[in-house]
Structures are given as C-alpha cells and as structure tokens.
Amino acid sequence: MASNDSIKKTLGVVVGLSLVCSIIVSTAAVGLRDQQKANAVLDKQSKIIEVAGIDSKGKKVPELFAQYIEPRLVDFATGDFVDGNAATYDQRKAAKDPAQSIKLTAEQDDAKILRRANTGVVYLVKNGDSISKIILPVHGNGLWSMMYAFVAVETDGNTVSGITYYEQGETPGLGGEVENPSWRAQFVGKKLFDENHKPAIKVVKGGAPVGSEHGVDGLSGATLTSNGVQHTFDFWLGDMGFGPFLAKVRDGGLN
C-alpha cells in the first residue's frame, strides 16, 4: 500500500510539473509571438520612414511614423480612398479571404501573387498640412520568394523618389541585391508611366540606356529575380493594381 501511495505521489508530482511547464512554455510562446509582431510592425515603419526620405537618426521610429505618415485605404477597382482603419488593416490576410479578395487569372497575374485584396493601403507622407510623397506597398514573385517592397512616388503620381525591399528570400549576392542601395538608387527620378499613361518602368538585362527615363539595370546573374521586379511593377502600376489610384493622383486627386 505504501508503495502504491509513493507511486501515486510521484505521478502527481510529474503531472503537476508537466502542467506548470506547459503553462510556462505556452505563455512564453504567446509573448514571443507578440514580440515578433511588434518587431515586424517596427521594421515596416522603419522602412517606410527610410523610403520617404525622413531622417530618423536619434529619433524614435513610431513617433516619426505618427508625425509624418498617414495610412489610407484605397479601393483597387476605382482608385478612390475608402473608409476603414488603415493602421490595423492586414492586406496579406485580406488577400487570402475570398470575401475580401479576387483570384487573379493567369493573364492578369503578371506578378504571380495568385490573389489580390479588394482594398489596399497607401502611405501619405505629410509635410504639415500638405502631402509630399506617396508610398505604395508592392509585391511579386522572384526566383525563390515573394518579394515585398515600398515604392515612394512624388505627388505627380509618376516620378519615383525611392524604393526599398523589406522582405525577400532571393539568393544572397545575386537576386538578394534588390536590397543593395546602389541598385535601388537607380530608380530615383524614373518615370513610372509613358506619355500614354501606360506602365513604363523597364528592368533591362545588360543595362539600361544612359539617360533613360524609365530604365534601370537588371541584376547581374539574377535574370529571374530581375524579371520578378519587372512583373511586380507591371502588375501594381496596371489596372489591377494602383493604376486607377495613380491616375487620380495625376489628375489632382490628392488636393
């Protein structure tokens, strides 16, 4: 009997310790997920501040973001601003929800993203009461990964003022050079559209002609990643992406 009692006590201790450990692990996992989400938000805000050309040295990114950046929701079909909480809207999640997105046909899907949310986010860069730039979030498939970037556009709705990739899994030293500041700098001053308002950015294998309004050099040794960048611009500047919104910007829609 004493032996049975001892076994029961031992089992009770083991079960109790297991429960305590599982609670600790679960709590730690939840805390870690929350921290990871917070870090992801901070990183995204930092990239938006960077591509907007705002000096963040010695300053807190969340405070700068709140001061200078205004997220707004845009209806892709019409290009109009729509009501909603742009600060908490998750466009990736919405794209996976059939009620909030559309499945793209092969003909529509230049960027190989499969689905597109019905509503997108743009970030307006504020200078006092005026808007100085627009930040467009874009993404498209590369060789190995989906590549996510922010493109800064002047208020003419046509001139690029910057681009930064904030999430990608391309080959380091090859396709991964989409993050290289020297390569990204080529986009500054380029025109997104031609005189007929058609998407005109060209990623040129072997190098863009000197003085080209629309061309940037392709990535050396990374043709498929370069193609992915090209297709990303083709899609998001087109009618299925931010094309209708940018057309309204060019017509003075921000005023």
Swiss-Prot record:
The modification FMN phosphoryl threonine is found at T223. Keywords: Cell inner membrane, Cell membrane, Flavoprotein, FMN, Ion transport, Membrane, NAD, Phosphoprotein, Sodium, Sodium transport, Translocase, Transmembrane, Transmembrane helix, Transport, Ubiquinone. One of its GO terms (molecular function) is FMN binding. NCBIfam families: nqrC (TIGR01938), PRK05346.1-1 (NF003746), PRK05346.1-5 (NF003749). It is found in: Cell inner membrane. PANTHER family: NA(+)-TRANSLOCATING NADH-QUINONE REDUCTASE SUBUNIT C. This is Na(+)-translocating NADH-quinone reductase subunit C. GO terms for cellular component: plasma membrane. NQR complex catalyzes the reduction of ubiquinone-1 to ubiquinol by two successive reactions, coupled with the transport of Na(+) ions from the cytoplasm to the periplasm. NqrA to NqrE are probably involved in the second step, the conversion of ubisemiquinone to ubiquinol. One of its GO terms (biological process) is sodium ion transport. It catalyses: a ubiquinone + n Na(+)(in) + NADH + H(+) = a ubiquinol + n Na(+)(out) + NAD(+). InterPro entries: FMN-bd, NqrC. The keyword Lyase does not apply. The chain crosses the membrane at residues 11-31. The lineage of its organism: Bacteria, Pseudomonadati, Pseudomonadota, Gammaproteobacteria, Vibrionales. Pfam families: FMN_bind. The keyword Magnesium does not apply. Its EC number is 7.2.1.1. It comes from the Bacteria. Belongs to the NqrC family. It is a single-pass membrane protein. Its cofactor is FMN.
